[in-house]
Amino acid sequence: MLKTISPLISPTLLKVLAEMGHGDEIIFSDAHFPAHSLGPQVIRADGLSVSDLLRAIIPLFELDSYAPPLVMMAAVEGDTLDPNVEARYRDALSLEAPCPDIVRIDRYAFYERAQKAFAIVITGECAKYGNILLKKGVTP
């Protein structure tokens, strides 16, 4: 057993977080994201919300300080975003330091980034546009 590591972080996720290098990206996706068809390693975190997982990993994960470290999917034209989703993620990511800005990109650009990601974590999140990309930084 390891101490101070949240039980929400599976052994597989812990290994992936440790293997990632600076500049590598990981997606925490909602339950409807097409992770398996995009290519990178997929980790299942069924039943967990994205915000709970973000809260669990942020003490272990340094965000990139040289490039925008947080990216979310923009709403498709004619659709709307629930601002509470981003607010929950910001709150979770603010536990260790102020949350950096979150950049929004269109759905297909997000899918392209996901194809190049180190891994995709599929959660039980049901919020629309509930996907977020994190870019790993250099530890101080």
UniProtKB/Swiss-Prot annotation:
The record's section on InterPro entries has: L-fucose_mutarotase (IPR023751), RbsD-like_sf (IPR023750), RbsD/FucU_mutarotase (IPR050443), RbsD_FucU (IPR007721)
* Gene Ontology terms, MF aspect: fucose binding; L-fucose mutarotase activity; racemase and epimerase activity, acting on carbohydrates and derivatives
Residues annotated as the enzyme's active site: 22
Main localization category: cytoplasm
Q: Which top-level enzyme class is recorded in the Swiss-Prot or TrEMBL entry?
A: isomerase
Q: Which residues bind substrate?
A: 30, 107, 129-131
Compartment list: Cytoplasm
Q: Which EC number applies? A: 5.1.3.29
Per the record, the pathway is: Carbohydrate metabolism; L-fucose metabolism
Respond yes or no to whether keyword Nuclease is given for this record: no
Q: Where is the signal peptide?
A: none
Q: Which reaction does it catalyse?
A: alpha-L-fucose = beta-L-fucose
GO CC annotation: cytoplasm
* Assigned keywords, A-Z: Carbohydrate metabolism, Cytoplasm, Fucose metabolism, Isomerase
- Determine the domain of life of the protein's source: Bacteria
Cross-referenced SUPFAM superfamilies, in alphabetical order?
Answer: RbsD-like
Q: What does the record list as GO biological process? A: fucose metabolic process; fucosylation; L-fucose metabolic process
Q: What does this protein do?
A: Involved in the anomeric conversion of L-fucose.
Question: So what family is this one in?
Answer: Belongs to the RbsD / FucU family. FucU mutarotase subfamily.
Quaternary assembly: Homodecamer.
Its recorded name reads: L-fucose mutarotase
- Name its species: Salmonella typhimurium (strain LT2 / SGSC1412 / ATCC 700720)
